[in-house]
Amino acid sequence: MAFIGKLFNALRRSRDRVSNAFQQLVKEKVSPQSLEQLEETLLASDLGLSTVEDILDIVKKHSHENFLNEVADYMQQSLDQEKQLEIQTPSVMLVVGVNGTGKTTTAAKLANYYVDQGKKVLLVAADTYRAAAIAQLQQWSKRLNVRMVCNENSQDPSSVLFDGLQSAKSEDIDLVIVDTAGRLHTYTNLMNELEKMARVVSNRFPEFNLISMMTIDANLGQNSLHQAREFAKSVKLDGAVLTKMDGTARGGIVFALKNELYIPVLFVGIGEELNDLEEFDHQEYIRSLLGLEEAEE
């Protein structure tokens, strides 16, 4: 699979640091000094304090065995989820997140993904504050041959969403994907606006299953965790897309999202093209992170 090689390369920064730290631990044997160095490395890779503490406990407990496999087993169990998100028909997916996390591109990638799954998709450009976002999504929609609903004369995202869902009902759309305005979690009025959009779906279009997907910049580390925590106060987050997974990304934030906020990473963005979005495979992710296997071409 090409994705394995891409993910392997995207995790290069964390993989090199983490695998080197564990290999050094094997050579030097477990000691207070080597454990402290491992702790610093894991924290720097954004795994989160609780996850790091658990890993250190495993290393101590299995210090005379192959503790790397034990660590891998723990990581896999901590990220286990029953199955990938199932899209009921009809559904509406709000793509939410902070400015600069790649919401508009991710909305297009998700549309491409679900069209490939055989879904009839409609895009809604509800980022009414940024004309460039509407124009960008319009270009993507043409490439995808997917219809897009927008209203360049309206500053009310909920109104645009309403129009989109009305169209979706008349056209028997399976999935409506909504590009929302980027907002800082500290902007109370914009967060209230997001809550209003969720109410429009639940109150006016109860036949639609509401899904909220947050875009998370893989390079922002623990700051992304704080952002997700605040967003979760306004809308129920069903999953996250880890974006900007390039060679500098640390990527360990997936553990904190799942273990502290119960938000699973469902997709990983590993490039700018429409096909550069993959289902998150946590087993492959952990093997890549720990350097347990070579990338497959």
Please tell me what each predicted stretch does:
Residues V96-G97, D179, T215, G269:
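Short beta-strand segments
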Residues P157-E171, H185-L290, E294:
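Conserved catalytic-core segment of NTP-binding enzymes
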Residues A126-T128, T180, A218, K244:
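Generic detector of well-ordered alpha-helical packing
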Residues M1-L11:
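Disorder-to-helix initiation segments
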Residues N9, R13-T128, A133-K169, I173-V178:
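Primarily NTPase-proximal linker/entry elements flanking Walker-type ATP/GTP-binding cores
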Residues N112, G182, L220:
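Active-site proximal helix/loop that lines the substrate pocket
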Residues V178-L184:
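Short, flexible active-site loops
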